[in-house]
């Protein structure tokens, strides 16, 4: 499969890439927001606070509105580097499956973004859910999902563009 990043960039070739990128960022951001909310609510519940389902759903909805912009910015920055790198690497690192390259690149990119953000944040971690290895791993699963979506869409588009 030829690498479509070797071809001339035209508006017709950039537009679908932007939509693929936005789909990956949107999915990762929404999933990550829900994951971090549930991790934080589990910590509150472990301290003995009652959390009825209605409150859990309301808090999740509020975080989708309130946390999503900040997390979306972090995801966007991470994916601006990770996904083009994956698109370039995927056809070149056989025998690794191309979708695995996209998923891994997205997770590594977001993991690095967490590290950079934490280095500059005034508190120990910018996102409370990433205080533990298990919380970080759960958050990175959202990036894996976004990477898989971008990879599947990009590979499908590349077959049609080639």
Regions found by a protein language model. Give the residues of each.
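Juxtamembrane/disordered regions of integral membrane proteins
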Residues: 2-162
């Amino acid at each position: 499969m030829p690498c479509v990043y070797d071809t001339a960039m035209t508006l017709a070739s950039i537009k679908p890439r932007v939509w693929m990128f936005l789909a990956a960022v949107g999915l990762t951001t929404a999933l990550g927001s829900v994951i971090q909310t549930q991790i934080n609510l589990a910590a509150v519940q472990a301290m003995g606070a009652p959390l009825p389902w209605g409150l859990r759903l309301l808090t999740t909805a509020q975080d989708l509105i309130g946390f999503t912009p900040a997390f979306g910015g972090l995801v966007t920055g991470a994916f601006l580097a990770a996904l083009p790198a994956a698109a370039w690497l995927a056809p070149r690192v056989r025998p690794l499956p191309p979708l695995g390259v996209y998923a891994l690149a997205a997770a590594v990119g977001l993991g690095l973004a967490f590290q950079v953000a934490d280095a500059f944040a005034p508190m120990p971690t910018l996102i409370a859910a990433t205080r533990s290895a298990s919380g970080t791993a759960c958050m990175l699963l959202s990036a894996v999902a976004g990477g898989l979506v971008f990879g599947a869409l990009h590979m499908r588009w590349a077959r049609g563009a080639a």
